């Protein structure tokens, strides 16, 4: 058990601008999960460990601790993709990464989508999928079975990380982004081999990429899009960091180079849960607007490249466009809904 004096020393360390050691970060997460951190001190620590000043070492150590507490269960599949990002860009777009998960699955890539209800966006992935009929509160064995039967499964984060309830009240009272907003995409219990991970601020691209590498992701892309989007963007260039060709390297992606039309953020706007569900349905059926469809095509291309299912960006765009045109992604969504209700 971590005593209060030790916790205060960690707070003083972080307030002084120093990063926590990986061991200290692990111990702090264990104390949080055990409910051993007093509320006032917990709030102070969450403020001190500011997301935009966090290190990859702190992220990886906390993520490993969370994943171990959840009971990580690697599938053994040679390729398993997650499209979970940080959310939190505050732009109110429709659920792009959720759409991408179904398109990638329809392209033949096994997908384990980790997600939760809305935190800082209008509608979270869990909200929109539940509205469409996806059963969120399934036993773990059924969640895993869906992956084999359908090719895609959804892991409702609160059901896999119940220990996080200990810090939920403090997070709600603070009402700001904290380290826990960054940990969600890193702690999928099925341990994906590949990931495309959108972040809400450009300064998060490098530390999140390094954290993924420390956690053993075989292939990944971390992205921050033009206009502030936590996805690849049609509004401007997207900053990328990935390990697809060896060590992590950064680059910039321009949608026009892939034959995709520029579009304002307003063209990607979502609404309430019913509106977002309707947009998701139409996009997956191949009936979305040009901007809606092309932002999903662009981000699916990123997912396919990250998973090694496309030889390059243009090949990924072509695969995603063809898949979306025949409505196969909606058939995947319907299959997941049916599986959860049988």
Swiss-Prot record:
- Binding, anthranilate 1: 85
The cofactors named for this UniProt entry are: Mg(2+)
**Which residues hold Mg(2+) 1?**
97, 231
The residues listed in the UniProt record as binding anthranilate 2, with positions renumbered to this chain, are 171
Q: What's a BP term from Gene Ontology annotated to this protein?
A: L-tryptophan biosynthetic process
Provide an example Pfam family for this protein. Answer: Glycos_trans_3N
Q: Which InterPro entries does the entry link to?
A: Anthranilate_Pribosyl_Tfrase, Glycosyl_Trfase_fam3, Glycosyl_Trfase_fam3_N_dom, Glycosyl_Trfase_fam3_N_dom_sf, Nuc_phospho_transferase
Q: Which family does it belong to?
A: Belongs to the anthranilate phosphoribosyltransferase family.
Name under which the protein is recorded? Anthranilate phosphoribosyltransferase
Organism from which the protein derives: Gloeobacter violaceus (strain ATCC 29082 / PCC 7421)
């Amino acid at each position: 058990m971590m005593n209060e004096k030790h916790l205060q020393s960690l707070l003083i360390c972080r307030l002084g601008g120093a990063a926590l050691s990986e061991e200290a970060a692990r111990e702090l997460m264990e104390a949080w999960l055990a409910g051993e951190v007093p509320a006032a001190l917990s709030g102070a620590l969450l403020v001190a460990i500011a997301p935009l000043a966090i290190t990859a070492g702190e992220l990886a150590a906390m993520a490993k601790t969370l994943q171990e507490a959840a009971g990580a269960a690697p599938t053994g599949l040679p390729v398993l993709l997650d499209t979970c990002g940080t959310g939190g860009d505050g732009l109110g777009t429709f659920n792009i990464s959720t759409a991408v998960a179904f398109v990638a699955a329809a392209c033949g890539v096994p997908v384990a989508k980790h997600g939760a209800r809305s935190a800082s966006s209008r509608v979270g992935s869990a909200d929109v999928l539940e509205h469409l009929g996806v059963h969120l509160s399934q036993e773990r064995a059924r969640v895993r079975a869906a992956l084999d039967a359908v090719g895609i499964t959804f892991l409702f984060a609160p059901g896999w990380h119940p220990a996080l309830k200990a810090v939920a009240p403090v997070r709600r009272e603070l009402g700001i982004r904290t380290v826990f907003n960054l940990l969600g995409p890193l702690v999928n219990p099925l341990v994906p081999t590949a990931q495309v991970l959108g972040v809400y601020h450009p300064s998060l691209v490098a530390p999140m990429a390094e954290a993924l590498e420390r956690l053993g992701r075989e292939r990944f892309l971390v992205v921050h899009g033009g206009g502030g989007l936590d996805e690849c963007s049609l509004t401007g260039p997207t900053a990328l960091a990935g390990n697809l060709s060896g060590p992590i390297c950064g680059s910039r992606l321009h949608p026009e180079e892939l034959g995709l039309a520029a579009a304002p953020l307003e063209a990607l706007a979502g609404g309430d849960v019913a509106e977002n569900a309707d947009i998701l349905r139409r996009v997956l059926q191949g009936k979305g607007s040009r901007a809606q469809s092309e932002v999903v095509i662009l981000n699916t291309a990123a997912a396919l490249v990250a998973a090694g299912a496309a030889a390059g960006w243009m090949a990924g765009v072509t695969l995603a466009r063809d898949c979306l045109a025949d409505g196969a992604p909606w058939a995947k969504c319907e299959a997941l809904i049916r599986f959860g209700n049988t």
